[in-house]
């Protein structure tokens, strides 16, 4: 309807959990001659942008294999995919689409050629009722005898955690998902009565807590992707192996390591990300700047146009 009225679109990912709808929107965008940009924001970051330029410039020769890991972090997974908005596939989408379509998009972009085959394994192994420890309760603040030793305890995550807790000065995400304008008092009220105070072993979640994807691309290059809830830190890491060298990267540190065979390692420190650019390694703000410039210039093809994003959704 928006395209019919002549609007340009900026779409949150995924485009749709249904392939037919993704392809229909792609077709409609062409018919309407409108800009449709999907929020695959990682393409706009300095980290992945620099990596892309190195690969396209032949820094490590021909790409033969790529390994990418999304370290979700135990507390982030518990917040979003056990207690939170994306805990049920039927109400949102599968984990690989809800969380990791960013990664599928980046892998396809970096490889530079179409993906020809995909296989995947994953399951929900840990956040299940049978794994609830003896003495646990339905809610973390309802007399749970296991609170002290449980890293998934809601009070730890939203009150005390040095990254996510309000006592560390964080009054934004994830605390702001529980209540508007978070305070410690308001958060405790939400934990006593709302979904984010539930025991992680007694929720109605059904999305996988770990998954591995193997891909084969045109020309024979291969890639693997691992998504895991069971990590201490929340960040992405990557290693690309080519015929003349390798590149390894840590997005949290914003550093790339270029190792050309037979030569000294080059450390590419991409610098500290300013607060304004903090979301997704700077990608959120940079994408919106890019979209405004794209529309002002009358362009139809962007880094994450619907055409560029459709194939990664198919993957």
Model-derived features: where do they sit?
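Beta-strand-loop-alpha-helix segment that lines the small-molecule cofactor/substrate pocket
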Residues: 1-43, 58
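Short glycine/proline- and charge-enriched loop/turn segments
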Residues: 6, 82-91, 268-273
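A short acidic, glycine-rich active-site loop
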Residues: 12, 89-95, 274-278
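Structured beta->alpha junctions
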Residues: 14, 40-43, 70, 229, ...
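Short, conserved clusters of charged catalytic residues that mark active-site
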Residues: 20, 46, 102, 208, ...
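Catalytic cores of eukaryotic secretory-pathway lumenal/extracellular enzymes that build
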Residues: 21-26, 35-36, 43-45, 49-50, ...
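Predominantly a Rossmann-like dinucleotide-binding segment in NAD(P)-dependent oxidoreductases
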Residues: 42-198
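C-terminal helical cap and adjacent loop that interface with cofactors, partners, or active-site loops
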Residues: 207-315
């Amino acid at each position: 309807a928006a395209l019919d009225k002549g609007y340009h679109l900026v779409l949150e990912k995924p485009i749709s959990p249904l392939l037919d709808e993704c392809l229909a929107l792609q077709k409609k965008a062409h018919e309407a001659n409108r800009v449709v940009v999907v929020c695959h924001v990682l393409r706009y970051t300095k980290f992945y942008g620099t990596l892309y330029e190195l690969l396209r410039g032949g820094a490590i020769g021909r790409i033969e294999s790529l390994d990418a890991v999304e370290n979700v972090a135990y507390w982030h997974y518990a917040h979003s995919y056990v207690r939170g908005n994306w805990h049920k596939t039927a109400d949102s989408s599968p984990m690989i689409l809800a969380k990791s379509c960013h990664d599928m998009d980046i892998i396809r972009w970096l490889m530079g050629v179409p993906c020809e085959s995909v296989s995947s394994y994953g399951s929900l192994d840990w956040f299940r009722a049978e794994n609830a420890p003896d003495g646990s309760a339905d809610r973390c603040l309802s007399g749970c005898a296991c609170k002290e030793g449980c890293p998934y305890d809601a009070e730890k995550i939203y009150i005390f955690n040095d990254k996510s807790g309000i006592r560390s000065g964080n009054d934004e995400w994830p605390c702001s998902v529980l209540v508007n304008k978070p305070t410690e008092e308001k958060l405790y009220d939400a934990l006593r009565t709302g979904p984010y105070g539930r025991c992680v072993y007694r929720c109605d979640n059904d999305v996988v807590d770990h998954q591995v994807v193997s891909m084969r691309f045109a020309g024979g290059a291969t890639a693997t992707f691992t998504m895991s809830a069971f990590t201490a830190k929340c960040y992405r890491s990557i290693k690309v192996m080519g015929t003349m060298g390798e590149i390894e990267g840590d997005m949290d540190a914003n550093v790339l390591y270029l190792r050309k065979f037979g030569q000294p390692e080059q450390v590419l420190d991409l610098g500290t990300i300013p607060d304004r650019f903090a979301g997704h390694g700077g990608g959120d703000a940079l994408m919106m700047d890019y979209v405004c410039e794209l529309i002002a210039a009358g362009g139809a093809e962007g880094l994450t146009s619907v055409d560029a994003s459709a194939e990664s959704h198919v993957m």
